[in-house]
Amino acid sequence: MEHLLSIFVKSVFIENMALSFFLGMCTFLAVSKKVSTAFGLGIAVIVVLGIAVPVNQLVYTHILKDGVLVDGVDLSFLNFITFIGVIAALVQILEMILDKFFPALYSALGIFLPLITVNCAIFGGVSFMVQREYDLVESVVYGIGAGTGWMLAIVALAGLTEKMKYSDVPAGLRGLGITFITVGLMALGFMSFSGIQL
């Protein structure tokens, strides 16, 4: 149990997808204007990572890994295309669910919901799972933790962006300029967690 808690805390704070690895920056910067929209996208990322990482772990372990299906046959060269296919299918299912049950959130996310399919934070989570050789339970914990860390970062950035609307930001820094500075300062803050040994 302590090992699983360690994986979760590391994936949320120490190895944050957005602020340590800078993965998923396209949607991270574009959807961080309002806290409500950022929160909705964060939940979507948690759901996709929480399902995609363990499903891809099963696919990798039982189909693609060297010698699993047939001795001497290594299908790991199909990792990328298989992982992307599984992620795309999960995002399509999530998109249909949001359209049916949460139409306001679906329209607020707009084009960025299908972009989760090619979001490098999602693919990075799956790739890190393979690289670190997590089992199924560890994959579930890691997927949910990585999604939670990404959501924490985007909601914090959205909150800061909403506060900056009322600030006197110099004309040359308005928009993406001040956002990049803010993300850099947030990343520096999250670097303080890197000294924690779990």
UniProtKB/Swiss-Prot annotation:
It comes from the Bacteria. InterPro entries: NqrDE/RnfAE (IPR003667), NqrDE/RnfAE_oxidrdctase (IPR050133), NqrE (IPR010967). One of its GO terms (cellular component) is plasma membrane. GO terms for molecular function: oxidoreductase activity, acting on NAD(P)H, quinone or similar compound as acceptor. The keyword Membrane applies. GO terms for biological process: respiratory electron transport chain; sodium ion transport. Keywords: Cell inner membrane, Cell membrane, Ion transport, Membrane, NAD, Sodium, Sodium transport, Translocase, Transmembrane, Transmembrane helix, Transport, Ubiquinone. It is a multi-pass membrane protein. The chain crosses the membrane at residues 11-31, 35-55, 77-97, 110-130, 140-160, 176-196. Its EC number is 7.2.1.1. Coiled coil: none annotated. It catalyses: a ubiquinone + n Na(+)(in) + NADH + H(+) = a ubiquinol + n Na(+)(out) + NAD(+). It is an enzyme of class 7 (translocase). It is found in: Cell inner membrane. PANTHER family: INTEGRAL MEMBRANE PROTEIN OF SOXR-REDUCING COMPLEX, NA(+)-TRANSLOCATING NADH-QUINONE REDUCTASE SUBUNIT E. NQR complex catalyzes the reduction of ubiquinone-1 to ubiquinol by two successive reactions, coupled with the transport of Na(+) ions from the cytoplasm to the periplasm. NqrA to NqrE are probably involved in the second step, the conversion of ubisemiquinone to ubiquinol. Composed of six subunits; NqrA, NqrB, NqrC, NqrD, NqrE and NqrF. Belongs to the NqrDE/RnfAE family. This is Na(+)-translocating NADH-quinone reductase subunit E. It comes from Haemophilus ducreyi (strain 35000HP / ATCC 700724). The lineage of its organism: Bacteria, Pseudomonadati, Pseudomonadota, Gammaproteobacteria, Pasteurellales. The gene is nqrE.
